[in-house]
Amino acid sequence: MPKGSSDKLYEITPGLELKVRPESIGGTPANRMIHRESNQLFIGPYVINEKGIVRVIPYSAMFGRPTANARHLSDPAGRIYSASMEEALYEIDVKSLAVTPLYRDEQDKTPGPKADLPGYHGKGMYSGQGRLVYANNGENSAEARRDPFIDSGVLAEWDGKDWKVVRRTQFTEVTGPGGIYGNENPATDPLWSIGWDAKSLILMLLDGREWHSYRLPKASHSYDGAHGWNTEWPRIREIGEGDDLLMTMHGMFWRFPKNFSLANTSGIAPRSSYLKVIGDFCRWQDRLVFGCDDTAKSEFLNKRRAKGEVAAPQSQSNLWFVDPEKLDHLGPVLGRGLVWLKEDVAAGTKSDPYLFGGLKNRALHLVHTGAAELSLALEVDREGKGIWEPLRTEVIPPNGYLFTGFKDDETGVWIRLVPSVDATGLTAAFTNKGDDERAAAGETPLKFAGISSVSDGESSARSGGVIRARSENKRNLHFAAKTTEGSLGLYTLSDTLTLTPETNPEELGWLEKHAAIPSREGVITTDAASVIYTDDAGKRFRLPRGNAAFDRAGPLGGERLCREVATERDLFNCHGTFFELPAENAAGFSRVRPVATHGLRIVDYCSYRGLLVVSGVDLALAGENRHIIRSSDGKTGLWVGAIDDLWELGKPVGS
C-alpha cells in the first residue's frame, strides 16, 4: 500500500490495553529506527518523541512501502535515510520532517531518478564504513513466482553517488552492533547482512571496508521462493541478553554475537526451530514480543488441491508473547546446507566457510561426476580467528558418492573444503540435527487434553466440524459443530474467546459448503509400505505410516489434511504426523519438514487472530485444560493455542 491504507498505528499499555492512534494513515511499513540525537523513533511513516507525541510524514511526501531506515552518511545528527520496498530512497530532516527524494519508488510515476537495482522487494538497510547498504530478496517476474532457483535479489551499496552490486542473491536483514540506533562508530564498526541461495543461508560481513561471506544451514525451506514473499522480515536484534543478539532466519532462532567481526567470528549457534512466520520482535517487560504473519487473506500464491476452498477471507496475524526461556525449547535444531551444488570447481578453490561449531550430529555428503577419484581437503578455523588448519582428507570414488560423519572431538567454528584437482559436477552437502529429547507419540500431553484420540472409545461428548475465521473485521470465527449423531448447528467463537450457539441456517450452510474438507481421492493413498501423497503436478512422495487407525476415516468423517496457518506455507496433518509444507513456489512437498507425531483425531484446524484453533474435542476428557474453550451450552468445544505448541506432541515417528 504505497499511498497508505486503513491499517492502524497501535499503542499497547503496560496493562495490555490496545489503543488505536488517531494519527494512523496505514500503509505497509517494516522500518524502525531510534535517532539518538533527537531521541525520536522513526517507525513506518510516524515519528514519535520521548513524550509519546506522534508526527506523521504523509505518503504524498514519501511514496512507497517503507522498509528500512538508516543513519545519514554526512549529516547523521540532522537527517536520516528511509527506503521503500520498491527502491525509493529519501532523506528526512529529523526536526522539520521535510523529505528529499534521492531515488523514486519503482511504482511512483513522478519524474526523477531510479536506483534500477537488480531484484525486487526491499528489506533491510544500514549505513557504515562510508556506504549505505540495501538488501532485497526477490524478483518481480512470472518465472520467479514459479521457480525458486532462478537468480533473484541483491545486496547493494551506495556511496552517496553511485550504486554497486555486492552480491546477486536474496538478502533480508542489514544491521550492525548498534542495532536499532545505528552503529556508534560508523567508520569502523562492522555491518552484517543475512540472506540465502539454493544452497544455504549466506551471512555477509563488512569489516575493514571489505566484504566476507559465510554459510549457515537452513532449518526450513518454506522461506525459499524467488519472488521473496515467503520470508517476511528476518531480523538480528537485541533482546536483553547482553552480548547475545537474536537472529531469526529460515525457521530457526539463532544466537548471534554482538562482537561478530573478522577478528572474532565465533559464537553463532542455533537455539531452536519454530513454525511461526516472524516479521519483527523486541523485548518488552518480561516477555519477547514477536510480530507474526499468520494466515494471509486469500493465501496469495499458496494454492494446492489438498486444501480445497478454504482460504482465509481476512489476514489473521497477531502478536506472540513468549517467555525468553522458551527460545531454547521449541522445535529441535535441524540444519541442511551446501557449499557446492553440481558445480565445476577448479583445483585449490576454497569453498565458503560453513558453520561447524555449535552444531551436533554433523555429517557431510559428497558427490562428483569426474572419471577419476577426487581428493578433498577439509580445513577448519578452530577459534573463529581466520586461522585455518587441516582437519582431514576425504577421497570420493570416480563418478561416485561419499558419506562421512564428524566426531564430537572434531572441533572448529568454521569448515571449508578444497579439491586437489579440477572437479566436475561437485556437490558438498552438510547436515546436522540437535538432540531431540521429546518422547515418541504416546500419552497425550496435558496441554492437548480433550482433543479426541484414536484410542478413545465411542463418546457422546466427542464433537468436531469445519471452522473458518470471518471477514470484514467481524473478528470472530464460525464453527459447524457435529457429533456422531448429527449436526449441533452453528457456533461463533468471539474475540474474547467465548463459544456460543447461533441460529443462522444460511451461514451454517455457507460454511459447510465453502469450508468443506475436500476428498483425499487422488491425493492420499496407502499401501503396505507407506502413505503416498500425490501433488498437483502428479509427483508422488512417500511418508511414514502412523497408527493403523488413520487408514480409516474418523468417527466424525473426513479430517483436514492441509491448511495454511502461517503465511505462505501449509500445515499438513497426515497419518498422525504434522508437517510444515512449503508453498509450491518454494519447491513444495520435496522440501517438507516433519514437526510432531500424535494420536489425535483432529477434524479441522485454522489460524484465528494469531491462534491455532483445532476442532475434534471430547469434553469428557478435557478436565481443567485451559486450552479448551467450552461452548456456553456445554455441547461442544474447541482447542486453542499457538502453532508452535505442536512441537510438544512428540518427536516424529512412523514406519
Could you say what each language-model-derived stretch is?
Residues 6-23, 46-64, 88-111, 142-174, ...:
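Surface-exposed loop/turn elements that mediate protein-protein interactions on large endomembrane-trafficking
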Residues 26-38, 62-77, 107-130, 167-190, ...:
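Repeated scaffold domains used in trafficking and secretory/extracellular systems
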Residues 276-344, 355, 603-655:
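Blade-level signature of beta-propeller repeat domains, shared across WD40, Kelch, NHL, RCC1
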Residues 366-370, 419:
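Asparagine-centered strand-capping/turn motif at beta-strand->loop junctions
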Residues 401-408:
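Exposed aromatic-hydrophobic patches
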Residues 408-425:
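Noncatalytic modules at the cell exterior or secretory-pathway interfaces
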Residues 421-454:
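Exposed low-complexity, polar/acidic, P/S/T/G-rich flexible segments that act as propeptides
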